């Protein structure tokens, strides 16, 4: 509505601008000034309305954001209501204890057990050294002649020969 009035006033200003009669021109100029004043007021009103519209949109956006943040806070609080930091610490300690116990059990199960045979560590080391020394001694005693390696089969027919290339002689 204000936009239509604005257009109407602009047309009136243009119409009154071109009059040649001095008293009529003076009257037209007065009307033009009034119309320009009304036009400025309408422009200011439209600007204020646009500003208010943007402010209202921003307020609605802020309201929605706050509602969502409140809902998120309530949901988080509900999720944490059943949790207590002491209970969480206790639970984490129980998990760590059970993990440690499981590792101890695995280590105990994987240890070799002699089932009544107790061997002295020094005796085992001495026996291992003897076995390690026997292997090189055996290799030294078993020196044999050269090994025979079977040769590949050779064709029994004559292969075609290539013609000899002639060499260029330079003089």
UniProtKB/Swiss-Prot annotation:
| One annotated Gene Ontology cellular component of this protein | amphisome membrane
Query: Which InterPro entries does the annotation name?
Result: Snf7_fam
Q: Name one Pfam family in it.
A: Snf7
Listed GO biological process terms: autophagosome maturation; late endosome to lysosome transport; late endosome to vacuole transport via multivesicular body sorting pathway; midbody abscission; mitotic metaphase chromosome alignment; nuclear membrane reassembly; plasma membrane repair; regulation of mitotic spindle assembly
Superkingdom of origin:
Eukaryota
Ranges where the record places region Disordered: 1-24, 132-171
Q: List all Basic and acidic residues biased stretches.
A: 1-17
The record's similarity note reads: Belongs to the SNF7 family.
Protein name per Swiss-Prot or TrEMBL? Putative charged multivesicular body protein 4B-like protein CHMP4BP1
| Organism of this sequence | Homo sapiens (Human)
